[in-house]
Curated annotation (Swiss-Prot):
Belongs to the tRNA nucleotidyltransferase/poly(A) polymerase family. Bacterial CCA-adding enzyme type 1 subfamily. One of its GO terms (molecular function) is cyclic-nucleotide phosphodiesterase activity. SUPFAM superfamilies: Nucleotidyltransferase (SSF81301), Poly A polymerase C-terminal region-like (SSF81891). Magnesium is required for nucleotidyltransferase activity. Nickel for phosphatase activity. Signal peptide: none annotated. InterPro entries: CCA_bact, HD/PDEase_dom, HD_domain, NT_sf, PolA_pol_head_dom, PolyA_RNA-bd, tRNA_CCA-adding_enzyme. CTP binds at residues 8, 11, 91, 137, 140. Monomer. Can also form homodimers and oligomers. Mg(2+) binds at residues 21, 23. This is Multifunctional CCA protein.
Length: 412
């Protein structure tokens, strides 16, 4: 029996990145030997075991053979005669097909070290094309390592295009698509994930609402980048700089979906695109089974982001009504989230990357003023039932009006 550290732990250590999870491959053993040694079996479809002390995963070396459609259609073969090289060959990318023995020596049968040095994401073998989930995984790796200068090898991108055009991605379940997307949204450069999907044709298949934005022009005066698809990726990039929250990043990605519905004869203007985009947000989220909290914020951002841009022109009643509409009294975090997504929208434009966004500050200040109005004082004043809410709203409007007079500049 020989045991090797494999995959991401080896890769990230070589890149000088923190190693989060360690996976091991066991060569020359059997399930019974693992059980006799005190390991606990957890793999149903193939032999994976938990170490009795560290609880890290130890998998018997195995090969996989395509036996059906999609990413689940594989037959696994694990036996003592399966070599380390056999096991590494089934992996997706060469940089993930590295192993390390107990002496610290790197085993690299597929030139993963060379590709690490050259910052290349390259598939190990043609078997890559048998698993459609790998298209999303490579896009996610491209996003995760973009800051290190990684790019996808030309032949790998070509294979990803062929897989997409062959209809392989249609076998992916919504849950797996969302899981990979959610993971990509946590990276430093989530926009790269969607750009890669567009480059291989997968964006049209998995995110048609976003793909439809490319080629849709916006007024050059406000959008020097002109193309709404490009603007969308720029705003996502900016959102990633402003917030680590997946909710904020996903909502920013979806903020302009309504522009994809504008008839070409009305271009480059997109009046009412915010509310129009709400249905597309709901459609996308329902299809991918996006969690409700993330969906709800994306709907609100689509509907109200343009309203925040015009904050100095809003009357106090409209401002308080906005807080009602986003349910800020019960979910106060939405004020900050709306401020961040709106700021990302403004700064996600060519030449505006460092722009100030006072509207975000005014929104936050107005919220502090509105929520500081005490409910207790309204009750103690003798108001009852529905009168309490009406009086509370009146006092909030008055407080915001007083603040706005002093702090918020009047529109020209």
């Amino acid at each position: 029996m020989k045991i090797y550290l494999v995959g991401g732990a080896v890769r990230d250590a070589l890149l000088g990145l923190p190693v989060k999870d360690r996976d091991w491959v066991v060569v020359g053993s059997t399930p019974q030997e693992m059980l006799d040694a005190g390991y606990q079996q957890v793999g149903r479809d193939f032999p994976v075991f938990l170490h009795p002390q560290t609880h890290e995963e130890y998998a018997l070396a195995r090969t996989e053979r395509k036996s059906g459609s999609g990413y689940t259609g594989f037959t696994c073969y694990a036996a003592p005669d399966v070599t380390l090289e056999d096991d590494l060959k089934r992996r997706d990318l060469t940089i993930n097909a590295l192993a390390q023995d107990d002496n610290g020596e790197i085993i690299d049968p597929y030139n993963g070290l060379g590709d690490l040095q050259n910052r290349l994401l390259r598939h190990v073998s043609p078997a890559f094309g048998e698993d459609p989930l790998r298209v999303l995984r490579v896009a996610r790796f491209a996003a995760r390592y973009a800051h290190l200068g990684f790019r996808i090898a030309d032949e790998t991108l070509t294979l990803m295009r062929e897989m997409t055009h062959a209809g392989e991605l249609e076998h992916l379940t919504p849950e797996r698509v969302w899981k990979e997307t959610e993971s990509a949204l946590t990276t430093r450069n989530p926009q790269v994930f969607f750009q890669v999907l567009r480059d291989c044709g997968a964006l049209r298949v998995l995110f048609p609402e976003i793909d439809a934005l490319f080629g849709v022009p916006a007024p050059a005066r406000w959008h020097p980048e002109i193309d709404t698809g490009i603007h969308t990726l720029m705003t996502l990039s900016m959102a990633a700089m402003l917030s680590p929250q997946v909710d904020v990043r996903f909502a920013t990605l979806c903020h302009d979906l309504g522009k994809g519905l504008t008839p070409p004869e009305l271009w480059p203007r997109h009046h009412g695109h915010g509310p129009a985009g709400v249905k597309l947000v709901e459609q996308l989220c329902q299809r991918l089974r996006v969690p409700n909290e993330i969906r709800d914020l994306a709907r609100l951002v689509a509907e109200f982001h343009d309203l925040i841009h015009t904050f100095p022109m809003l009357n106090p009643k409209t401002i308080v009504k906005l807080f009602d509409s986003i349910d800020a009294w019960r979910k106060p975090q939405r004020v900050e989230q709306l401020a961040l997504t709106s700021e990302a929208d403004v700064r996600g434009r060519t030449g505006f990357e460092s722009a100030d966004y006072p509207q975000g500050r005014w929104l936050r200040e107005a919220w502090e003023v509105a929520q500081s109005v005490p409910t207790k004082a309204v009750v103690e004043a003798g108001f009852k039932g529905v009168e309490i809410r009406e009086e509370l709203t009146r006092r909030r409007i008055a407080a915001v009006a007083s603040w706005k007079e002093q702090r918020c500049p009047k529109p020209d």
